[in-house]
Amino acid sequence: MIDRGALMSRYSRASDPDIRSVFHREFEGNQKRSEDFYRRIFLEYGDESIAELVTAQVGIQNVSNVISKVIEEIRIGLSYLEKSTRYVAYDRKVDGHYLFMQAEKIGLSGEAAREYTDLCNRLFDLYSSTLPRIEEEISRQWPIESFDFNIDGNPRNYKELDENGRKLAQKSYRSSVRSRALDDARFILPASTLTNMGVSGNGRSFIHLIQKLMEYGVPESERLAHDLYEELKGEFPQIIDDALSQHGQDIINYKRSLASLFPYTDGGRFEKVRLIKYSNEREEMQKVLALLMYPFAEDASGIISRIKAMELSEASAILERIRDLRKNRRMKVGRPFEAVNYVFEVTTNYGAFRDLQRHRFLSIVRKPLTVSYGFDVPPIIAKMPDLSEEYAEAMKDAERVYRIIKERYGAWIAQYAVPFAYRYPVVFTTNLAEATYFIELRSTPQAHFDLRDIAIRMYNEIKSVHPSLAGIIKFVDTGDYPLGRLSAEVRKNVKAGGI
């Protein structure tokens, strides 16, 4: 892989217009030349951009849901796929163990290790017994006969379908019930739950990832940083060395010093979604219109003068025409709308935060996971008295174990004991283009109900301060869908050819 990067970097400095000629003349059959080239340009001259010309794909197995979120904080240069708690059940043991990070691997011993292990086993036992009970309750509350199915372009009630239609409807319904049960049951899983990740990216970003894992400073993250370093040395040896060089260690120490500037405290009052920073709508509209017109008109100052002279109704009419041009949510609003910025504070549960974080244009600032803000109860479990009591007891036990671990090992290690149900406040900056994409995508029926709630609340917050600009968010869906994946499952099965 390193020879390809060296070739592209050398090509950027060559007068020869044919990259093949450069390869044949300078690199073909000469691996040492490409390594020497990288050593000279990257290490001696400090040209870090050439580290973006080599790429690798890495599988990371059995990483906790504490550290997987640290990994996914690197938002530029790395792409991720992660095992989903929405579609994959965690009710089976592997080699006699549930899939959570073992106590010794996170640095626990003695009483804290026993309490932690007992808690995780209890949570996984409850999760495993809860899944079928939730499925049964969903089927009782929303039987298949209560739904219409659009199989041939003509929505009909289940009772009106022919035999083949009923078979397809039953298959779609079972998958939807299972998905909804997994959505509710995942609240029980602890942050120590293991996941698998596929990571694809360039050398420069892998350097940043290794340094971030070292900076985080818990046993799992430091162990993973060294494992990644050793694995990637075979792919781009001259580049990855920079991650843990003296220069790299200076960066790690600097980030750790920043993190220690303020003592860790928790507490406060948090709303589900709160817009905490925005600008005057008229000024923001003028900015958007100026950027929309810039490719087709005079200099920026001339455009701005013209727009300032516009009546508000004229400016609104232009935005309305853009709205009318959008026929579906995949027709994105465009870069000029990125100039409108917002800062939100969102308090959701840790399970939903994991989905929120995948939107890389949300610049998230977050805290360690804690039990201090209480926990959410998923809707189906809340309607089942016996199960909701078991659930609440398990959450209280998690709080007790968290405090035991925190007292001895600190807040960062104690995160592993916290279930996904616990509330997790974060702040993020975004812009109108990304907010439009997020709101329209995450308000679709098949989105997780917590993400739908966040998306709809964000829309309402934006609409309350920027009513004209909010009109561009055309495809927000505020409907109520007890089985949100049902229509998507029907479409999938119809496309697959039925049964």
Swiss-Prot record:
InterPro entries: Thymidylate_synthase_ThyX, Thymidylate_synthase_ThyX_sf. SUPFAM superfamilies: Thymidylate synthase-complementing protein Thy1 (SSF69796). It comes from the Archaea. Transmembrane segments: none annotated. GO terms for biological process: dTMP biosynthetic process. Residues 1-246, 271-476 form the ThyX domain. Belongs to the UPF0159 family. This is UPF0159 protein Ta1429. It comes from Thermoplasma acidophilum (strain ATCC 25905 / DSM 1728 / JCM 9062 / NBRC 15155 / AMRC-C165). The lineage of its organism: Archaea, Methanobacteriati, Thermoplasmatota, Thermoplasmata, Thermoplasmatales.
